[in-house]
Amino acid sequence: MSNKFFTFLIMGVAASGKTTIAEKLAEKINSFLIEGDDYHTKENIYKMSSGVPLNDSDRYEWLIKIKNEILKRNKKQNLVVTCSALKEKYRTLLGPQNFNLVYLKVSKKTAHQRIRSRQGHFMPDSLVDSQFAILEEPQKSIVLDESLNTNEMVKKLVSIYKSTYQ
């Protein structure tokens, strides 16, 4: 009998809560966390830190690195992956749709407020609008909006995991 492993891809604009949710979820379901921000090139981090939005070609190498990490691990262990994945073509590039796509939906106002309060992150508040401008909301996903608190979101995802995997 072959092992079946589960992958959550958590997407959304900057400051939607991807890392916060992913860290808690990965711990709850004993999964390996792939934090998309860790795969950005130095050039991309510099560009974003300077207030310049990334374009499709800037994102390509980053998305390929995340995809390769997923492919390296998804046959061996459960995964929780964070990636803004703002466009459908980015999500398609990440690989076959054999992951559970989670869209963290927040308003521009909430994203701006959260990003202003966060410390030590390269993404400035000035780039929030550019992320919303290119966002293509997914047609098929688990949508969690800002009306839920972190614990409620994680609880929902754990429930989906248990009902699907166990």
List each language-model region with its residue ranges:
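Phosphate-binding P-loop
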Residues: 1-5
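Hydrophobic anchor at the beta1->P-loop junction of P-loop NTPases
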Residues: 10
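Conserved lysine of the Walker
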Residues: 18
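Small-molecule kinase domains that catalyze NTP-dependent phosphoryl transfer to phosphate-bearing small molecules
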Residues: 117-160
